[in-house]
C-alpha cells in the first residue's frame, strides 16, 4: 500500500480524506465498533489506543490490532496514543512502554500510519522515525492545544518543526475562542500547505472549529476527522453529514 495521506498544495481546494476514530475500551467493543464504522467507508480508521483499558498488556494490544486489521475491509489504520497533556485519556504505562508498543505494531505490519507527538523526547522520536522508515509506515508528528489558538506564526512553526524532524505528515489541532481564531488556523494551514513538502492536517476543535473540519481542505488540510459511532475530540461531525458537506464543496468550489 502506498502512503495513505497525500500532499495538497494549498493553492487549489481539494477534498480531504475522512478519518473515523475507534475508541472502544475492550476488544469486543472495538470489533463491534470497527464493523459499524468500516461500513461507512471512511478513508482511514484511527485506533485511539489510549482509550483501550488493556493498553498495559502488550500481547493483548497486538492481538487486538491484528483483529482490527482483519476487520478493516482494507481501510488503512492510523495508530494513536494521545497523551493527557495533549487531550488524551489517562493510561498506566510509561512513555518507554508506549514507544515499545509503537515499535511492535509497526514491525508486525499491523498499522499503516502512526501519530507521534512533537513533544515526544528526541531519542524516542528518532527511534520511531527509523522504524517507520524501515517498515514503510507513514508517520505523523502532531501538536494539540486544547486551551487556546496560538498565533499564525506559531502554528506554522509547529508544522515546519514536524517537517524538520523528518515527519511524513504534520498535524496541528487547536482550541478556538472566536471565529478569528478559526481563520488564524486556516490561514496558517494555507501557508503551510503552500510552502512545506509534506502533507499537513489541521483543525480547530469545538463547535466553532467545525468550520475548519468542513472547509479545511480548501486551505490545504489533507485529512479531516468525523464520527461514525463515538467522538474522540470535540467538534467532530457525523461522517454522513460531513461527506454531504464535502460533496457540496466539491461541486461548487473545486468543480469536481
UniProtKB/Swiss-Prot annotation:
Residues involved in 3-dehydroquinate binding: 46-48, 82, 213, 232, 236
Record-annotated active site: 144 (proton donor/acceptor), 171 (schiff-base intermediate with substrate)
Pathway info: Metabolic intermediate biosynthesis; chorismate biosynthesis; chorismate from D-erythrose 4-phosphate and phosphoenolpyruvate: step 3/7
InterPro entries listed in its UniProt record: Aldolase_TIM (IPR013785), DHquinase_I (IPR001381), Type-I_3-dehydroquinase (IPR050146)
SUPFAM superfamilies referenced in this protein's UniProt entry, alphabetically: Aldolase
Top-level taxon of origin: Bacteria
Alphabetized UniProt keyword annotations: Amino-acid biosynthesis, Aromatic amino acid biosynthesis, Lyase, Schiff base
One example GO MF annotation: 3-dehydroquinate dehydratase activity
Role, per record: Involved in the third step of the chorismate pathway, which leads to the biosynthesis of aromatic amino acids. Catalyzes the cis-dehydration of 3-dehydroquinate (DHQ) and introduces the first double bond of the aromatic ring to yield 3-dehydroshikimate.
NCBIfam families noted in UniProt: aroD
Family: Belongs to the type-I 3-dehydroquinase family.
Protein name, UniProt field: 3-dehydroquinate dehydratase
Lineage: Bacteria, Bacillati, Bacillota, Bacilli, Bacillales
Amino acid at each position: 500500500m502506498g502512503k495513505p495521506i497525500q500532499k495538497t498544495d494549498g493553492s487549489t481546494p481539494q477534498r480531504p480524506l475522512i478519518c473515523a476514530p475507534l475508541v472502544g475500551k475492550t476488544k469486543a467493543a472495538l470489533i463491534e465498533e470497527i464493523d459499524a464504522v468500516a461500513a461507512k467507508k471512511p478513508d482511514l480508521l484511527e485506533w485511539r489506543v489510549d482509550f483501550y483499558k488493556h493498553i498495559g498488556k502488550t500481547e493483548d494490544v497486538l492481538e487486538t490490532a491484528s483483529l482490527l486489521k482483519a476487520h478493516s475491509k482494507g481501510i488503512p489504520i492510523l495508530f494513536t496514543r494521545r497523551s493527557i497533556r495533549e487531550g488524551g485519556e489517562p493510561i498506566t504505562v510509561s512513555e518507554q512502554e508506549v514507544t515499545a508498543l509503537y515499535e511492535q505494531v509497526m514491525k508486525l505490519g499491523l498499522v499503516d500510519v502512526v501519530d507521534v507527538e512533537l513533544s515526544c523526547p528526541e531519542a524516542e522520536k528518532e527511534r520511531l522515525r527509523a522504524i517507520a522508515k524501515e517498515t514503510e509506515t507513514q508517520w505523523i508528528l502532531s501538536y494539540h492545544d486544547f486551551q487556546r489558538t496560538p498565533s499564525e506564526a506559531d502554528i506554522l512553526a509547529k508544522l515546519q518543526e514536524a517537517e524538520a524532524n523528518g515527519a511524513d505528515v504534520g498535524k496541528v489541532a487547536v482550541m478556538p475562542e472566536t471565529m478569528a481564531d478559526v481563520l488564524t488556523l486556516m490561514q496558517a494551514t494555507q501557508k503551510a500547505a503552500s510552502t512545506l513538502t509534506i502533507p499537513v492536517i489541521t483543525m480547530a476543535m469545538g463547535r466553532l472549529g467545525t468550520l475548519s473540519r468542513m472547509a479545511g481542505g480548501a486551505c490545504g488540510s489533507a485529512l479531516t476527522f468525523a464520527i461514525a459511532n463515538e467522538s474522540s475530540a470535540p467538534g467532530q461531525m457525523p461522517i454522513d453529514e460531513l461527506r454531504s458537506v464535502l460533496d457540496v464543496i466539491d461541486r461548487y468550489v473545486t468543480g469536481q
